[in-house]
């Protein structure tokens, strides 16, 4: 089973690299404009992992169905790359994760609940950038271990790692080294100092493989990843609320917002559920394309 899921996870990466859409699509940030000169086109960007790419495709297709010209720039990179792109006009719209975005913008943020995070994020966004209505759907960060590791060290919560962290290697994306929702927060809030940190991908096939092969003993995975259940992995309970609510939310350039855009993306957010994300991520892992999965989800919810 683990082998099959690893193959599927590898497919995730291939999909991310080879995805094409029926919409106009450009290379991520290649020849990016210095300002928003074309007010008729909305450029939808994504981070460099499949769920973000899928959500960007859903947004773009939903808007296109309402007669709005769209382009996609998928797999731009991490928040440290695409947030400046949103500010400089290279992109106009991003599917975002509310809590992570808030933490990026406000290093001292303490909001945790969906309502508190949304309120704080509204205030924290830079001038010219706005958030639309958040979805109830969430994809939360987590610290995952194998069942064997959990049983060996009697781990149920992140706090349970403290006596043994010095024996364990932690895996995660490179930006976890400097993010509050990463090594910094694990040390400050939980007192964890791991043996070492191994830079991997963003909860993708490299992370999964490293965890299953015991190259790392704890790793950053996301709650909507179908590989968690398929590989009998354990997400340790975050009893000190290190990871804030991660509701999916459209974040976009204020200059591109109008009634049609707002109503369209609000309808997408209202229809989207956490279960939908798990199911759609599973389909991507089984080689379905972003276009096909997005189109079928929109059709199911009569949004195209």
Predicted regions and their residues:
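Bacterial N-terminal signal peptides that target proteins for export
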Residues: 1-10
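Sec/Tat signal peptide C-region and signal peptidase I cleavage site
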Residues: 20-24
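An extracytoplasmic/periplasmic, membrane-proximal ligand-sensing/linker region
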Residues: 38-41, 181, 187, 192, ...
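Bilobed "Venus flytrap"/periplasmic-binding protein-like clamshell domains
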Residues: 41-71, 136-209, 288-292
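Beta->alpha turn/N-cap motifs
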Residues: 78-79, 89-101, 117-118, 145-146, ...
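Alpha-to-beta junction loops
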Residues: 87-96, 165-168, 185, 207-221
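Ligand-binding "clamshell"
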Residues: 105-132, 213-215, 227-240
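A bilobed periplasmic-binding-protein/Venus flytrap-type ligand-binding module shared by bacterial periplasmic
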Residues: 141-151, 246-259
């Amino acid at each position: 089973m683990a082998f099959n899921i690893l193959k599927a996870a590898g497919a995730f990466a291939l999909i991310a690299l080879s995805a094409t859409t029926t919409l106009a699509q450009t290379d991520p940030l290649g020849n990016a404009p210095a300002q928003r000169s074309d007010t008729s086109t909305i450029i939808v960007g994504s981070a460099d992992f499949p769920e973000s790419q899928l959500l960007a495709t859903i947004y773009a297709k939903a808007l296109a169905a309402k007669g709005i010209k769209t382009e996609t720039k998928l797999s731009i990179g991490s928040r440290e790359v695409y947030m400046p792109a949103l500010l400089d006009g290279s992109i106009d719209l991003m599917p975002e994760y509310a809590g992570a975005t808030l933490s990026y913008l406000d290093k001292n943020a303490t909001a945790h609940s969906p309502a508190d995070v949304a309120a704080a994020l509204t205030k924290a966004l830079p001038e010219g950038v706005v958030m639309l209505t958040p979805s109830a759907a969430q994809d939360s960060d987590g610290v995952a271990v194998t069942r064997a590791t959990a049983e060996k060290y009697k781990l149920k919560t992140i706090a349970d790692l403290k006596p043994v962290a010095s024996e364990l290697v932690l895996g995660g994306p490179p930006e976890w080294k400097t993010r509050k929702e990463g090594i910094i927060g694990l040390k400050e809030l939980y007192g964890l100092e791991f043996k070492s940190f191994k830079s991997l991908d963003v909860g993708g096939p490299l992370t999964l493989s490293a965890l299953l092969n015991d190259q790392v003993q704890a790793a950053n995975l996301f709650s909507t990843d179908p590989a968690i259940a398929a590989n009998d992995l354990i997400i340790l309970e975050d009893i000190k609320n290190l990871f804030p609510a991660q509701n999916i939310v459209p974040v976009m350039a204020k200059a591109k917002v109008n009634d049609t855009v707002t109503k369209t993306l609000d309808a997408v957010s209202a229809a989207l559920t956490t279960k939908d994300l798990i199911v759609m991520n599973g389909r991507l892992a089984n080689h379905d394309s972003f276009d096909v999965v997005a189109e079928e989800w929109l059709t199911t919810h009569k949004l195209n």
